[in-house]
Amino acid sequence: MIVNPSRSIATAVHIALLETTPEYFLQVAQWHHQECERQGVKSSLALRQQRLVLHVQESRIPKTLVALFDGKLIGCVSLVNYSYRSSERMPKGANESPVWLSNLFVLEKYRQQGFGNALIDAAKHYASDLGQDELWLSATDYTDYYQKRGWEIIRRTRLAGRQVNVMRVGL
């Protein structure tokens, strides 16, 4: 999938499934681990790799998409299912197994140039192709970023000891 994320960028970004670009697996796992640690979530690189393996198998979800610009890996985003043990823990309005946008990451040098938008758009398209009619996410730091892109806050809760906003967008 080719996306032109911003008029200021002359060449296009290429968005691909991680399973089709296995050479980037270790870097993506490192980014996931790094972001978990930044957010105060207990993690290990081995655990991130173990979980990411599920994203490159034949199942439809979980999946990770990567962004390549000028032949270089610059970002990623994941689609995952979080299972709930009871309907009381499920966000109000969620279906039984909602798809969540997770692990959005763009290298700092490439931020604020439309690459994050391109990754989100590609993830939304992928989820829509699977028959999903909405995506969910939890955000701590960048709630405004998502709200400007049509996401709505459904509730606020605590996750891994941090206050987060649970958000949803229709597809």
Feature names for model-found ranges:
Residues 1-27:
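Conserved N-terminal entry element of GNAT/NAT acetyltransferase domains
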Residues 110, 114-122:
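Conserved acetyl-CoA pyrophosphate-binding loop and the N-cap/start of the following alpha-helix
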Residues 40-69:
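Active-site rim helix/loop that mediates acceptor-substrate recognition in acyltransferases
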Residues 133, 137-142, 155-171:
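C-terminal "cap" of GNAT-fold acetyltransferases
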Residues 147-157:
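Conserved acetyl-CoA-binding loop of GNAT-fold acetyltransferases
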Residues 64-66, 72-82, 87-90, 100, ...:
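Conserved beta-strand in the GNAT
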